[in-house]
């Protein structure tokens, strides 16, 4: 079985959207919805498939194809892009690095939203930096994602 794995690190944003869910709190600064978890997952998926990164697929800046788009929509576009090129997600995980928001009570809902967007199981965990740095002071949120993909027949989307 030809499995490929990679890691993605999302750009750092003030939070509003995270793991395809709307969170209470400060707004975001980003070209799309600023969903750092979704963006890290996109980078991991594309990198594992050898297809570049989020900027390769969507472009960068306010004029990019991702401008104004929701993280779930961008994830679905990414999976379609992988499928068309003979790859599909097998599993993924996302680690959110932040003191706020607290992920625990919404973790299962976030996992479901991410899993539905990419069509495979996604696990999510969170950690803090114990008050250190911009994530510790609540100025922003970071995320790291790992993704496992496998080759598929583009016409059937079945593993080869």
Model segments located where?
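Active-site His/Glu-centered metal-binding helix of metallohydrolases
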Residues: 37, 41, 45
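Glycine- and Gly-Pro-enriched alpha-helical subdomains that act as flexible
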Residues: 44-88
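Short, conserved loop-to-beta-strand elements that form functional interface hotspots
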Residues: 92-136
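Generic structural signal for well-ordered, non-membrane alpha-helical segments
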Residues: 30, 34, 38, 67-71, ...
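C-terminal edge-of-domain segments
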Residues: 135-156
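A short glycine/serine-rich beta->alpha loop
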Residues: 21-32, 61-66, 131-135
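Polyampholytic, low-complexity intrinsically disordered segments
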Residues: 11-22
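Single conserved hydrophobic/aromatic residue that forms the stacking wall/gate
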Residues: 1-13
């Amino acid at each position: 079985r030809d499995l490929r794995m990679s890691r993605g690190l999302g750009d750092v944003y003030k939070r509003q959207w995270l793991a395809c869910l709307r969170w209470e709190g400060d707004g975001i600064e980003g070209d799309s919805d600023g969903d750092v978890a979704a963006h890290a997952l996109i980078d991991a998926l594309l990198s594992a498939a050898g297809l570049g990164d989020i900027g390769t697929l969507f472009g960068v800046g306010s004029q990019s194809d991702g401008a104004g788009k929701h993280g779930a929509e961008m994830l679905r576009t990414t999976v379609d892009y992988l499928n068309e090129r003979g790859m599909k997600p097998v599993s993924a995980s996302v680690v959110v690095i932040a003191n706020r928001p607290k992920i625990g009570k919404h973790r299962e809902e976030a996992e479901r939203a991410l899993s539905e967007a990419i069509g495979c199981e996604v696990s999510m965990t969170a950690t803090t930096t114990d008050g250190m740095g911009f994530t510790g002071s609540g100025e922003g949120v970071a995320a790291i994602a790992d993704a496992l993909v496998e080759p598929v027949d583009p016409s059937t989307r079945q593993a080869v």
